[in-house]
Amino acid sequence: MAVKIRLKRMGSKKAPFYRVVVADSRSPRDGRFIEEIGTYNPLTQPAKVELKEDRALDWMLKGAKPSDTVRNLFSKAGLMEKLHNAKNEK
């Protein structure tokens, strides 16, 4: 099973709010997911991102691939650097 970390769209029309979820790559964008690991609100200034960093790092170490947008969010939060350091420690 290929697992992705991606955004699930919530909110109303023209007022998007996203949840960062771990999901099977074959499931629909807003469909079934395995675990919710954070939120992203692009409408606030600056955009508000809340992440469960330990869970996100755990899933990526297990092989989950983040989408491009989620990868950018993780980079800004410093999570990709932590992943790189964790992989090099082994």
UniProtKB/Swiss-Prot annotation:
GO MF term list: structural constituent of ribosome
Gene3D superfamilies cross-referenced by the UniProt entry: 3.30.1320.10
Keywords: Ribonucleoprotein, Ribosomal protein
Signal peptide (UniProt feature, chain positions): none
Record bears the keyword Ribonucleoprotein: yes
Superkingdom as given in the UniProt entry: Bacteria
Pfam families linked: Ribosomal_S16 (PF00886)
Gene Ontology cellular component list: cytoplasm; small ribosomal subunit
InterPro entries: Ribosomal_bS16, Ribosomal_bS16_dom_sf
One GO term (biological process): translation
Family statement: Belongs to the bacterial ribosomal protein bS16 family.
NCBIfam families named among the record's database cross-references: S16 (TIGR00002)
Protein name listed in UniProt: Small ribosomal subunit protein bS16
Species: Halalkalibacterium halodurans (strain ATCC BAA-125 / DSM 18197 / FERM 7344 / JCM 9153 / C-125)
